[in-house]
């Protein structure tokens, strides 16, 4: 069911002006475009069989669409002032549960104990993007896909490929467990209040075959990775000296995986870095 874009945009603006001022401490920037909500649902492939988790429903603009199209939606909202509004707005919706809690403090083990194949769809506070993603990835056994509205440069970083200047520890932290894709750019004017930067919609699909986890323990992988990225301006041969390796030895190992002596961490894919670790430990 399509909503009238202008009507609902105006309704949200009125609610914000009369009853709820967006709170900077929660990083609130509300979606104001019905067409954008439709595009999000299409890309995330939300249907009557989908269980969805939303973080920060805000004024319920995207929430309404998720309820209409999914099997069940659970939403976490931290803002005390929004709870009465959301409860009233969706009081007759049987496939909706609103949890009044800070998502970062939620016991997701309890939440996921009877849930599998969940999709996460959310317009999240940008200042805690990494903590939210890390927390969700802890429950990758229960989650199939994650779709997040994030700051544009963060989406570029997470979905970047080897040799990109955006390749980072965060890139590997996500791509070790999942495939990440930059889906589309969202102009800042699509939000109320208007933020300072553009946003992007990011897709993260969990690697259910444990493609990389089956090859190496996450503890070992991230031990090397954190050192490799400890100083992005320095070469890996310099950074890995913190783990007790001589620079000459690391340079020889780099040659064996087709890299130059001055190679930096951003040149590696996840698989490439796993192969490099294996050479280091032989």
Spans of model-derived segments:
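Catalytic cores of RNA-modifying enzymes
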Residues: 1-219, 223-227, 266
